[in-house]
Amino acid sequence: MEVLLLLLTLSFSAVVISSNNSIPVHFWLFTINNLEEYEDMVFDGSSVTLSPDTLYDVTKPTKVVVHGWGGETHIDEIFALAYAEAGLDYNIIGVDWRNMEGPAQEQVVEVGVYTAHFLKALIEDYNLLLEDVHPIGWSYGAHVVGRLDLI
């Protein structure tokens, strides 16, 4: 049973990795300067588009925060407020995958790989340094974070 599950996971991952299609996952940017309203970081599956007046600052540490199953708790906002209250000026990127459909086991793989492609695009297009990225997952979001290495 464990081998079968591993094979199913690997085969599903391979399908996602080869796809550059957009899926219903959104990336929200919070900084110390926009705690009330996030900035949308648009990702089409291969490239990231930032607003011309973006608050994203590649020179600051980046926290990638992934909510749990269903996304009822806005954990990204909670982290953004906590870091701001501590006087820490970070890029907080919330990964919103609440609109995904299907079994959670498949979703965490797909969202993890998609998020990895998003980060790869930030690295290639905006010179993000991987060592400045700290992924944080809450509940099922931890499983998403665990899939960031699949590309």
Residue positions per predicted region:
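Flexible, membrane-associating and regulatory peripheral segments of lipid-active enzymes
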Residues: M1-G94, R98-V108, A116-L130
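Extended hydrophobic secondary-structure segments that form protein cores and membrane-embedded regions
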Residues: T9, V133-W138
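Glycine-rich nucleophile elbow surrounding the catalytic serine of serine-hydrolase chemistry
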Residues: H67, I136-R147
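Hydrophobic alpha-helical cores of multi-pass transmembrane domains in eukaryotic membrane proteins
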Residues: G112-T115, G137-S139
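Conserved hydrolase catalytic core segment
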Residues: I151
